[in-house]
Design a protein with these regions (language model features):
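Active-site phosphate-binding strand-loop segment of PLP-dependent enzymes
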Residues: 135, 139-191
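PLP-dependent enzyme catalytic core of the Aspartate aminotransferase-like
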Residues: 43, 47-51, 55, 82, ...
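Conserved PLP-binding catalytic core of the aspartate aminotransferase-like
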Residues: 10, 281-289, 295-329, 340, ...
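Conserved PLP-anchoring active-site segment centered on the Schiff-base-forming lysine
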Residues: 102-121
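Conserved N-terminal alpha-helix of the aminotransferase class I/II PLP-enzyme fold
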Residues: 47, 51-95
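N-terminal "arm"/small-domain region of PLP-dependent enzymes with the aminotransferase-like
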Residues: 3-58, 187
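Active-site C-terminal subdomain of aminotransferase-like
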Residues: 185-188, 195, 200-305
């Protein structure tokens, strides 16, 4: 793909990430970002990070376990726990290390982890590091989930782990049915809200809140690198679970803590999310507009119910070609190929932010229609 000039990765951005970015000196429409709330370039979020660096320095030079706990880490944890409706929360330096560190602590030999086969790679790595038996069910197939639960020893721990919003396809977990099966088989549930936080539920509290099932979900995970305009992640649960994780999650104990700037920026973004409900309204306005326009234009967009819109190509090379030709037209989108999806499900991922306009969506769809027709995909 490099020789053909269609290698689509590591493209350099020369400034802030907003709805438009500068790349190679040219204006490019950004539809490849996870910044759903549109806060990565917000002056208040930036200033909060700058002020924290001035107060605390550039880094913590230690683990949370030792010298790396700042008062703003604890403040962010308290506010996140209240926001998602759990007793306590624990912050990690990245979202990936939440899943890869927390999951191995929750089950042991003779226990079971049951995952959707489209769950994020960090969940996959987390379950690989556990000593439990790992089962998976077909994507959002509740009959298959029940079949996997029936294989489990009824007396063992059974942990169902699921993405609230699936990061490539944009569809939601069938949380009401998962909760019903949890009770039927005496299981527990962990929901990864990486792409649900800031998007679904009251004030963007996530998919668990959207379904009104926060109290039925045992652990809620989230990241700061998407709607909270920073980097890092957290797990929220009952006090006893958080205390156990504090003293056992290796990625928490043996990693340096999140930087002051990252922590303060996430905290400020969380405040803005709660103070500006119109941000969420704007996101859903432009999302619904884009969904309608893509369907009218004949694109295959699957079962998405979110600002993540998959444009199915179903061919790896053509997926790369779409990405390259769209970029040449001034539209940044992301290619999704195996192992992030099945070989027959390759797609380009088009994602929206709260500050995208209808005009930007129209321009992008016009250019993508041209590209898809050029490759005989429309």
């Amino acid at each position: 793909y490099m020789a053909e000039g269609i290698y689509p990765y590591f493209r350099e951005i020369e400034g802030k990430q907003g709805t438009e970015v500068l790349m190679g000196g040219h204006r490019v429409l950004m539809f490849g970002s996870n910044a759903y709330t549109g806060l990565t370039g917000d002056d208040r979020v930036i200033e909060a990070g700058v002020a924290a660096m001035r107060k605390y320095g550039s880094g913590c030079a230690g683990s949370r376990f030792l010298n790396g706990t700042l008062d703003i880490h604890v403040q962010l944890e308290k506010e996140l726990a209240a926001f998602v409706g759990k007793e306590e929360a624990l912050c990690f330096a990245t979202g990936f290390t939440v899943n890869s560190g927390v999951i191995p602590c929750l089950t042991g030999r003779g226990d079971y982890i049951i995952c959707d086969d489209r769950d994020h790679a960090s969940i996959v790595d987390g379950k690989r590091l556990s000593f439990s038996q790992n089962l998976k069910y077909k994507h959002n197939d509740m009959a298959d989930l029940e079949k996997q639960l029936q294989k489990c020893n009824p007396d063992a721990i059974k942990l169902i782990i699921v993405d609230g919003v699936f990061s490539m396809e944009g569809d939601l977990a069938n949380l009401p049915e998962i909760v019903r099966l949890k009770h039927k088989y005496n299981a527990s549930i962990m929901v990864d809200e990486a792409h649900g936080l800031g998007v679904f539920g009251k004030q963007g509290r996530g998919v668990c809140d959207y379904f009104g099932l926060t109290n039925e979900v045992d652990l809620i995970m989230g990241t700061f690198s998407k709607s909270l305009a920073s980097i890092g992640g957290f797990i929220a649960a009952d006090k006893s679970i958080i205390n156990w994780l504090k003293h056992n999650a290796r990625t928490y104990i043996f990693s340096a803590s999140a930087t002051p700037a990252a922590t303060a920026s996430a905290l400020e973004a969380l405040h803005i999310l709660q103070q500006e409900p119109e941000r969420l309204e704007n996101l859903w306005n432009v999302t619904n507009y884009a969904l309608k326009r893509f369907r009218e234009s004949g694109f295959e967009i699957g079962a998405t119910e979110s600002p993540i819109i998959p444009l199915y190509v179903r061919d790896t090379e053509k997926t790369f070609m779409v990405t390259k030709l769209a970029f040449d037209e001034g539209v940044f989108i992301n290619p999704v190929i195996p192992p992030a999806c099945a070989p027959q499900d390759t797609l380009v991922r088009f994602a929206l932010m709260a500050n995208h306009t209808h005009e930007q969506v129209d321009e992008a769809i016009q250019k993508l229609t041209k590209v898809f027709k050029q490759l005989e995909l429309l």
